[in-house]
């Protein structure tokens, strides 16, 4: 908590540079979409009484250009150094599918609770297929010392999903779902 406000770290997945740029598909780049969504979540959370730190502060920001591993460790370090109350990493899925899924760190009951409320609210706002809540050992979930989740918004390489990801209205729907889920997790009403 910072000044009595929960501190949330939003992690727009991947980097702008050649190291760890993420998936591409349907004319979209994951690093652009994740930043666009996270930058829309931030003011919604701030309006609802949260302090928000972003791991990337602009579209062309790079968390680390050394390696994918260094980038993942640095993202967790940002959250740990900020003494965050919650960490959410935002991603786009790829590989031919459809829908939204949210991950939590293996055997973390509070992570599962967070992932469940994020998933439910995002699916409700966006209306894509509910692929469920799943456990995983992703580095950003493993190395963060607070409740954490990783959201795979939709499939960037599937036309219907990409249409949602690439549109302003779709990005705003993701942002509302994420912000509503975080508010619900902390027992706050979304305003």
Regions found by a protein language model. Name each.
Residues 74, 120, 163:
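Charged/polar, solvent-exposed surface patches and flexible loops
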Residues 39-50, 80-84, 92, 119-128, ...:
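Sec-exported extracytoplasmic/periplasmic mature domains
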Residues 49, 99, 129-130, 145-147:
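A generic structural signal for alpha->beta connector loops
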Residues 1-9, 14-114:
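Catalytic-core regions of hydrolytic enzymes
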Residues 6, 77, 81-82, 87-89, ...:
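Active-site-adjacent mobile loop/cap segments within catalytic or ligand-binding domains
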Residues 106, 122, 155-157:
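Non-catalytic surface loops within mature trypsin-like serine protease
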Residues 109-134:
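Active-site-adjacent substrate-binding region
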Residues 30, 119, 152:
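Acidic-residue sensor for enzyme active/binding pockets
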